[in-house]
A protein has these predicted regions:
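Local sequence-structure signature of Cys/Sec-based thiol-disulfide redox active-site neighborhoods
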Residues: 1-30
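Hydrophobic beta-strand residues in large extracellular and virion-surface proteins
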Residues: 4-6, 37-39, 78, 82
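Thiol-based oxidoreductase modules, predominantly thioredoxin-like and allied folds used
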Residues: 34-45
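Acidic pyrophosphate-coordinating catalytic loop
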Residues: 47-51
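Structural micro-motif
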Residues: 52-61
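Non-catalytic, surface beta->alpha helical segment in thiol-disulfide oxidoreductase systems
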Residues: 62-91
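Short acidic DE-rich linear segments
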Residues: 89-99
Length: 99
């Protein structure tokens, strides 16, 4: 399982990033039916500031690695970060990229 954190104290921003994450997850499920992610929304400024100084715009953490700061990621960027996280897991799934 991949753990993902959405960092933003503004609910509409978290919602937009969560929709992108779910779209990326659904795309990966087509080729990896056992793929799972756990999404946590970090809302408290004090918790966000432990990870990044950028608090006005959303940020994204994948398996405790800060991958996106202060912007809304594109679905295909998120797919790339999730694929990378899959490959780094013990007993990971082999990910093949299409042509």
């Amino acid at each position: 399982m991949i753990n993902v954190k959405i960092l933003s104290y503004k609910s509409p921003q978290r919602y937009a990033v969560k929709r992108t994450l779910i779209g990326a997850k659904n795309e990966l499920l087509k080729t990896h039916p056992d793929f799972e992610i756990a999404i946590t929304e970090v809302k408290e400024l004090s918790e966000i500031e432990k990870i990044t100084r950028v608090v006005i715009l959303p940020s994204l953490v994948v398996n405790e690695k800060l991958v996106c700061v202060g912007r809304f990621p594109h679905k295909y960027e998120v797919i790339g970060w999730l694929r990378e996280a899959l490959q780094l897991q013990p007993g990971s799934i082999t990910v093949r990229q299409g042509k």
